[in-house]
Amino acid sequence: MKKLRLALNKGEKLRFLSHLDYAQAVERMIRRAEIKMAYSEGFNPHMKISFSSALALGVTAAAEYIDMDVLEEDSLESIMERLNRVAPPGLEVLGGKEMPEKVKKMMAICNFAIYEVTGPITDENADWNALLKPFNGATEISYEKVTPKKTRTIDVKEFVKEPIVASVKDGMVTLTMGIGIYPQGTIKPSEVWNLGKDQYNWPITTGYEIHRKAIMVENEEGRYTPLEINY
C-alpha cells in the first residue's frame, strides 16, 4: 500500500456541487479509472481518502487536495493519467506526490486560504484604495457571526490579517483576501464581502462568485501548499 497526495481542481461546471457531491464525484472517478484502493474495515467499508477542506456549495477552487491509500504498483504519473482520462468536466488531476505512510490529516494542518470574491460594483468611479483603507488599517473589527447553533461576536482581523486587494474590470470588482483557518474557527469570504458592503459602504451588491485560489499550510517558516510538505 502507498499513500498518494493529489491536487485536483473544482472548475466552473462543478461550482454548485456540495462538498459531499464533490467527494462522491472524486470517488466515481477513482472507480472508473479502476484504481485499486484500500478500504476501511467494519460494516460500511469506504475508500481510504481524505480531503484538505470542505469546499462550500457555489465555491470553485484552483486546487483541492486529497490523500488516498492505493494498492497499486502503477506509477504516480500513470495513476494520474488514468484518473484524468475518466474525469468529469470541471475536475482534473493537476499534480501529485507519494507521501509517507503516516501523515497528519490535511484538514488539521491547512490553516490559510486565499480567496477571490467577484461581483458587480454600483459606482464605477470608486477609489478602492481609499474604500479599503479603513478596513485594512483597523486593528479590530467586531462582527456578529450567525450559525445554526448560536450567534457570537468575533474579531474579523483575527482571521483577515493581511490587506484586502481590489481589482476592477468591466463593471466588476475582485477582492483578493487571505483568511486564517484556526481551531477556534474562521470567517467566510462571503461574510467579509457583506461586512464591507454593510459596515464600510463598499459599492457592491449581494451578488458575487467565490473562487479559492489556494489553500496552504502556514508555519513559522512560511506558507506551503500540501504538495510542498511531507507531513
Residue ranges and their predicted role:
Residues 2, 7-9, 13, 17, ...:
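Extended, well-folded interaction surfaces typified by the phenylalanyl-tRNA synthetase beta subunit core
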Residues 38-70:
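Short, charge-patterned binding micro-sites
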Residues 15-20, 73-78, 125-129, 183-187:
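Ordered, soluble secondary-structure elements with a strong preference for glycine-centered loop motifs
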Residues 133, 137-231:
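Core RNA-modification/binding signature centered on pseudouridine synthases
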Residues 8, 68-74, 117-123, 177-181:
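Short beta-strand-to-loop capping motifs
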Residues 79-87, 127-137, 192:
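Short amphipathic alpha-helices in soluble, non-transmembrane regions
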Residues 62-116:
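Ordered, amphipathic secondary-structure segments that act as subunit-interaction surfaces
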